[in-house]
């Protein structure tokens, strides 16, 4: 195995957005270049697009600063949202009942890989 590192990752943990909603946004950018993904996320109407964009930008910055990779050649090779801890709240209802409210959180992970210029 060669010593050339061609990928970098970034993770945002305990993000207060449900994993299903985060996955909906992540599916838009998986396999795209970092520049293309950030422009898609900038105009995506979903609330989860902001934390996903932050993680994509962080992964690109990690690749550039830690491994010296060119940010223009980076492609999102892996992106996923895992379920984080769920906060449970109770909402009082009629006749002494209480309904449970689940405030879900997620862990968003993005892996970027350097792709050769001629591979496009």
Swiss-Prot record:
A Gene Ontology term for the protein's cellular component: cytosolic large ribosomal subunit
The UniProt record lists the keyword Ribonucleoprotein: yes
GO molecular function terms noted in the UniProt entry: rRNA binding; structural constituent of ribosome
UniProt KW keywords: Ribonucleoprotein, Ribosomal protein, RNA-binding, rRNA-binding
Record InterPro entries: Ribosomal_uL22, Ribosomal_uL22_bac/chlpt-type, Ribosomal_uL22_bac/org-type, Ribosomal_uL22_CS, Ribosomal_uL22_sf
PROSITE patterns xrefs: RIBOSOMAL_L22 (PS00464)
Any one GO BP annotation for this protein: translation
Subunit structure, as described in the record: Part of the 50S ribosomal subunit.
Family classification: Belongs to the universal ribosomal protein uL22 family.
Function text: This protein binds specifically to 23S rRNA; its binding is stimulated by other ribosomal proteins, e.g. L4, L17, and L20. It is important during the early stages of 50S assembly. It makes multiple contacts with different domains of the 23S rRNA in the assembled 50S subunit and ribosome.
Protein known as: Large ribosomal subunit protein uL22
Species of the source: Corynebacterium efficiens (strain DSM 44549 / YS-314 / AJ 12310 / JCM 11189 / NBRC 100395)
Lineage, broadest ranks: Bacteria, Bacillati, Actinomycetota, Actinomycetes, Mycobacteriales
């Amino acid at each position: 195995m060669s010593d050339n590192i061609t990928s970098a990752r970034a993770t945002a943990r305990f993000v207060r957005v449900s994993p299903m909603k985060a996955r909906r946004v992540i599916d838009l950018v998986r396999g795209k270049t970092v520049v293309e993904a950030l422009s898609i996320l900038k105009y995506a109407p979903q609330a989860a697009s902001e934390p996903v964009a932050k993680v994509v930008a962080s992964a690109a910055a990690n690749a550039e600063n830690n491994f010296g990779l060119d940010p223009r050649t980076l492609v999102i090779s892996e992106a996923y949202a895992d379920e984080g801890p769920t906060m449970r709240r109770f909402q009082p209802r009629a006749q002494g009942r209480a309904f449970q409210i689940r405030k879900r959180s997620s862990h968003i992970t993005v892996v970027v890989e350097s792709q050769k210029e001629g591979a496009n």
